[in-house]
Amino acid sequence: MEDTTFLEGANLAGITTLMNNLHINEQANLEELEKQVMGKQQSFPTDHFDEELNGLAKSLGINFNDPEFSLDSAHSVISKKPSGRGSDKVHGGIRRDSVCTDSICSDSVCSGSIRSGSIRSGSIRDGSIRDGSIRSGNIRDGSVRSSKTRRGPARNSSSRNDRGYSLSTHRKKYAESEASQKTAISKRDRKNHYAESEYSEKSIKPSTKQVDRLINHLRSNGDPNSFYKKEHDYERKTKLVKLEKINMLLTYLGNEQISTDDIKIPTIDSSMQEIDDVIEMLTLRNVGIRYSSIAEEILIGLARGLEIVFDGTREIPFLNYRPDYTGLHNTFMIKLFKMRYETSQVVGNLVQNMSPLSKICLELGPSLLLYPALIRTKHKASEDLYNLLQKGPEDPFTAYNEIHETLKKNNK
């Protein structure tokens, strides 16, 4: 048989030259390990199948090279050994010493019926053997009769019918079991293949970009050390960008008078994981304050709108009710200050999938509603204070109380 083995590790030739010696155990002999991998052999599945088939045929006494066992042969001898006694052993309804000669007609022999040691060379159907008859399902005197025997159907045809039915039923059940076994094996192999491919994709995907960059660099320069130097420079630049982002967040939080003393500020020598953790903490603290401010502005703007619409002078149709919501925004401010965390969570869940432009509109929208009310309140307070000062009450205590009441009224 042709040798179809091949080296499984042939595609790994020269892999040790791509490895970074700083990340490998010093006691490991890379050249020896590469030789062991390169020397490993693997055979094709068809060779394994042929070995199992030949071993099974040998255990059953079958020789595939013998022409007497060929299905296409007209003279197929099953067994020529007669028993030492008068009664011959019958296996599967067919005698071992029966000989298939030229006188057996075509309708008396078919493939796949004789199960003497799994030899499938012929079958006896409901038809008759013309050069001799089988009596009572067995051959008498342990021999095949000569051409002088009476030609015609066998006497015990019912037994042969039962035997033929049992053989056909057995063949049918065997074919069904074999088909179900193949289906189960194919499903199991397909499931294992998908599991292995999914595992290989998960394990290889994170390092694919780095391997591609290394291969491209080796094709252009051919020096692995220069590649690792570039990787180190790239990591250093990434750290510098992230440290600058940390400084911007610290400056913004400092302007908002938000404490950051509990956060350890990383340096250029810190690991990338530490820098990312600090950025995440500062970002959460920043957006938490911003999101709570957005919620407060929106709700206070709604309260201002209710104050303008329902100031005690307008009546609700069909209810004959005149609500007065003057000063509602002050109550909202006190309540929302106690729920800054909840309001930041609500707004954060709403804006996490929004675009930057939408976030800007959400940030500036409440200010458009609040600005006219703030300007109107400021102008009114200035006018009232000016009129009070121009009036000039004689009692200073009375003037102080009037100014205080005016400011308190305008701040509502």
Curated annotation (Swiss-Prot):
Region (Disordered): 116-208
Compositional bias of kind Low complexity: 116-126
Family per record: Belongs to the asfivirus B407L family.
Organism from which the protein derives: African swine fever virus (isolate Tick/South Africa/Pretoriuskop Pr4/1996)
Protein name: Uncharacterized protein B407L
Keywords, ordered alphabetically: Late protein, Repeat
UniProt-annotated stretches for the region 7 X 5 AA tandem repeats of G-[NS]-[IV]-R-[DNS]: 112-146
Biased composition (Basic and acidic residues): 192-208
